[in-house]
């Protein structure tokens, strides 16, 4: 199978090899050293500021989103949620579940956030802003710099979910004044799913220390204290953390975060150029490098997903909900190159010849 899904993605041979090894015991100095290296690489790649920290949670990225909501906010806050798809809605749902007042800035599916729309909420008493910098369900990439300026002007605590955009699109945490960055192991980190990463600015570290959170597993202050010695409070996904270490070193060896972003960008541009004459419309007004969301003009999107899987050995990523039959997504993350794009192109051309596209 050729994997154009958005996670898990195709792993490099080096990362796969680590997954085939026996999982070692982890309460050791050697594992602590590896975890501290993981933290330093992450802080370097997201361009975090002085005093920033990172922790690694054994959970899906939604678990990290929930941990941030629980540990950084309370019923005394008033949050603005950028809600342009299913993952923006997830932030809104988490706020509701934890009884934290929140207002959704709703965007039409696939539309970018403009400064005019954002500044309708200027000076309205908000204390925090939550955004999926890349909205995975639509492929839209929001302007993090514009959002950061808005947060500075209004003194908002700024939370950035970069689960699929980290390492695929440019992001400098300190430059955009983000207080929290969230990402996951199965996107551009190109490792198996199961580990989420939370990066804290110095301000966020202090905020978490003061927050009373009624949770043991999702207590981020406890996570931060343990990570000081390169450990976790509970048994982590040891094998995946070893694979993350291998992958982070792989990125460094290949020229660092800038080169990785360029590589993903080339992959996205190559795909979009190759399919420009096929009967699709592009969904996103401001597309991320990480994925291309496609609307088939004459075919059922979910049927195409099934045909590609069953007859061509190709995975793309179907949408759910109202977009199930109208949109599917093609990922550009992981160990893919132009040759894989060409294979997908030929499959789509064949479907067109068969009258199925």
Q: What are the residue ranges of the model-derived segments?
A:
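PLP-dependent enzyme catalytic core of the Aspartate aminotransferase-like
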Residues: 1, 322, 326-357
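N-terminal "arm"/small-domain region of PLP-dependent enzymes with the aminotransferase-like
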Residues: 1-29
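Active-site C-terminal subdomain of aminotransferase-like
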Residues: 10-11, 186-269
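Conserved N-terminal alpha-helix of the aminotransferase class I/II PLP-enzyme fold
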Residues: 19-67, 86, 90, 94
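Conserved PLP-dependent catalytic core of the aminotransferase class-I/II
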Residues: 41-45, 248-282, 307
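Conserved PLP-anchoring active-site segment centered on the Schiff-base-forming lysine
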Residues: 73-88
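Active-site phosphate-binding strand-loop segment of PLP-dependent enzymes
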Residues: 112-167
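Conserved PLP-binding catalytic core of the aspartate aminotransferase-like
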Residues: 280-311
């Amino acid at each position: 199978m050729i994997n154009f899904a958005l996670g898990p993605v195709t792993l490099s041979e080096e990362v796969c090899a680590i997954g085939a090894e026996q999982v070692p015991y982890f309460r050791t100095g050697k594992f602590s050293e590896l975890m501290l290296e993981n933290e330093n690489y992450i802080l370097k790649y997201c361009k975090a500021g002085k005093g920033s920290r990172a922790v690694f949670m054994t959970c899906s990225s939604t678990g990290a989103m929930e941990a941030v909501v629980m540990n950084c906010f309370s019923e005394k806050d008033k949050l603005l949620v950028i809600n342009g798809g299913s993952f923006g809605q997830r932030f809104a749902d988490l706020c509701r579940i934890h009884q934290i007042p929140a207002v959704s800035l709703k965007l039409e599916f696939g539309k970018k956030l403009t400064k005019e729309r954002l500044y309708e909420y200027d000076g309205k008493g908000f204390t925090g802003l939550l955004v999926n910098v890349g909205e995975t369900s639509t492929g839209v990439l929001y302007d993090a710099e514009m959002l950061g300026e808005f947060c500075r002007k209004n003194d908002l605590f700024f939370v950035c979910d970069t689960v699929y955009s980290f390492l695929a699109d440019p992001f400098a945490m300190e430059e955009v004044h983000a207080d929290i960055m969230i990402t996951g192991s199965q996107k551009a980190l190109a490792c198996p799913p199961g580990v989420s990463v939370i990066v804290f600015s110095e301000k966020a570290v202090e905020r978490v220390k003061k927050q009373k959170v009624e949770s043991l597993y999702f207590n981020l202050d406890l996570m931060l204290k343990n990570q000081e010695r390169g450990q976790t409070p509970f048994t982590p996904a040891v094998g995946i953390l070893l694979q993350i270490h291998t992958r982070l070193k792989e990125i460094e060896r290949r020229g660092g975060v800038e080169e990785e972003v360029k590589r993903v960008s080339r992959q996205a541009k190559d795909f979009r150029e190759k399919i420009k004459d096929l009967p699709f419309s592009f969904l996103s007004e401001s597309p991320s490098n990480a994925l291309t969301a496609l609307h088939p003009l004459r075919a059922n999107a979910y049927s195409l997903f099934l045909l590609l899987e069953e007859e061509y050995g190709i995975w793309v990523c179907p949408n759910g909900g109202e977009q199930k039959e109208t949109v599917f997504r093609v990922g550009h993350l992981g160990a893919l190159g132009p040759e894989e794009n060409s294979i997908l192109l030929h499959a789509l051309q064949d479907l067109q010849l068969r009258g199925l596209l």
